[in-house]
């Protein structure tokens, strides 16, 4: 043990040195978070709160849904390229295959043979002819038939020999064609056998 000198020549014993104490961690004491000691600019930023979701849309009315469904079905049936812009379908002869749907208010020779005269043949030897439309036109056996179906374009030999003709003296004659559907009508070609009617 260390001693200290006193004034009388005697020595005063020094108290024994206490051994150093080691601090033990206190489990009940909360230690500061190391991130809390970091400077403000070094602390990680917490993610922003999520944005509130928009309110749900009201259900579409049944009529609107049905209308849009019908439009979608129509566009799905269109040929390619029609839904993006104007559509020009292929043109064709609307009379082909529709002979039963074609009718005329007057046709010569349906009940009995009837005579008729062609004005353009006045200077020729034969000016008047017989119309017998009781049977359909045939290039070999019945060339005097002039039913309304003769106006159809066919690939029969000598097609210009067949035509439709109304009765003599009948006015306000009309031709009717039932197409059974809607079409985009572009043009009509009519070829007259004689002079055009006034």
Swiss-Prot record:
Compartments, record wording: Secreted, Extracellular space, Extracellular matrix, Basement membrane
Domain Laminin N-terminal: 83-198
Ranges of Pro residues composition bias in the record: 45-61
An example Gene Ontology CC term for this record: extracellular region
SMART domains hit by this protein: LamNT
Pfam families from the UniProt entry: Laminin_N
GO biological-process terms attached to the record: cell adhesion
UniProt-annotated stretches for the region Disordered: 1-64
Disulphides: none
Keywords tagged on the record: Basement membrane, Cell adhesion, Disulfide bond, Extracellular matrix, Laminin EGF-like domain, Secreted
Database matches in Gene3D superfamilies: Galactose-binding domain-like
Signal sequence range: none
InterPro entries, per database record: Laminin/Netrin_ECM, Laminin_N
Stated role: Binding to cells via a high affinity receptor, laminin is thought to mediate the attachment, migration and organization of cells into tissues during embryonic development by interacting with other extracellular matrix components.
PANTHER family from the UniProt entry: LAMININ SUBUNIT BETA-2, NETRIN/LAMININ-RELATED
Quaternary structure and interacting proteins, as annotated: Laminin is a complex glycoprotein, consisting of three different polypeptide chains (alpha, beta, gamma), which are bound to each other by disulfide bonds into a cross-shaped molecule comprising one long and three short arms with globules at each end.
Name listed for the protein in its UniProt record: Laminin subunit beta-1 variant
Organism of derivation: Gallus gallus (Chicken)
């Amino acid at each position: 043990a260390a001693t200290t000198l006193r004034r009388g020549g005697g020595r005063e014993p020094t108290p024994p040195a206490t051994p150093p104490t080691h601090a033990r961690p206190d489990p009940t004491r909360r230690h500061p978070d190391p991130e809390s000691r970091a400077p403000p600019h070094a602390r990680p930023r917490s993610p922003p709160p999520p944005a509130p979701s928009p309110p749900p849309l009201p259900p579409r009315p049944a009529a609107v849904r049905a209308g849009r469904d019908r439009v979608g079905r129509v566009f799905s049936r269109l040929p390619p390229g029609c839904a993006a812009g104007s559509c020009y379908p292929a043109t064709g002869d609307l009379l082909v295959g529709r002979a039963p749907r074609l009718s005329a208010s007057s046709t010569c020779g349906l009940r009995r043979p009837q005579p008729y005269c062609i004005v353009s043949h006045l200077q020729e030897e034969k000016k008047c002819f017989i119309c017998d439309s009781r049977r359909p036109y045939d290039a070999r056996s019945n060339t005097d038939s002039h039913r309304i179906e003769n106006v159809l374009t066919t690939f029969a030999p000598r097609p210009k020999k067949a035509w439709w003709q109304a009765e003599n003296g009948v006015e306000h004659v009309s031709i009717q064609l039932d197409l059974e559907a809607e079409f985009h009508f572009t043009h009509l070609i009519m070829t007259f056998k004689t002079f055009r009617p006034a």
